Design a protein with these regions (language model features):
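Conserved active-site tyrosine of GNAT-family acetyltransferases
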Residues: 123, 128
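Short secondary-structure junctions
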Residues: 11, 130-131
């Protein structure tokens, strides 16, 4: 059911063992079974996740995260939703923020690529600030870790850099 343009029928909860197949399929659809960031190959399914489940039981979104030592910081590793512009991504961000706050976390951060215009619109509207540009990071990852990274990304933008954003949880 829509209310004010947002889905109000998703439940956000920690990923459970029973979600593993659906989570794998969901990440595969979003080409995110493995990724590269900051010179490291990452496998999101190896990390904790929150899932957004629609009223019918289907996976509507998923956020994977990496808590730092003693929860001093928490990195959002992946965030994907089935349908954009319905509030599912915001619900997942707010849920990981609450989790991080309860753990005493001081920094919630995310890395995106320079072509991800949608993310660069989404995160600042949810309180994230751009803190760092890792120039050439995608080029280096393509050369040494993940050669299948395309040279041109979304909207025809050359894919070269990683952009780091953060907020307090």
């Amino acid at each position: 059911m829509l209310r004010g343009g947002y889905v109000d029928a998703v439940k956000v909860r920690p990923r459970e063992a029973a979600d593993q197949d659906a989570a794998r399929a969901f990440l595969a659809r979003h080409n995110s079974l493995r990724g590269a960031r900051l010179g490291e190959l990452v496998h999101p399914l190896d990390h904790p996740a929150l899932v957004a489940v629609a009223a019918g039981g289907q996976l509507a979104g998923m956020l994977t995260y990496v808590p730092g030592p003693d929860w001093q910081q928490c990195e959002i590793l992946t965030l994907h939703v089935g349908d954009q512009w319905r509030g599912t991504g915001t619900a997942l961000i707010e849920a990981v923020g609450r989790l991080a706050r309860r753990q005493g976390c001081g920094r919630l951060w995310v890395i995106t690529t320079n072509d991800n215009v949608d993310a660069l619109r989404f995160y600042p509207r949810r309180g994230f600030c751009l803190v760092r540009v890792h120039r050439g990071a995608v080029d280096r990852s393509r050369a040494s870790l993940k050669p299948e990274i395309p040279t041109v990304g979304a909207y025809g933008i050359p894919l070269r850099d990683e952009i780091e954003l953060e907020r307090q949880p």
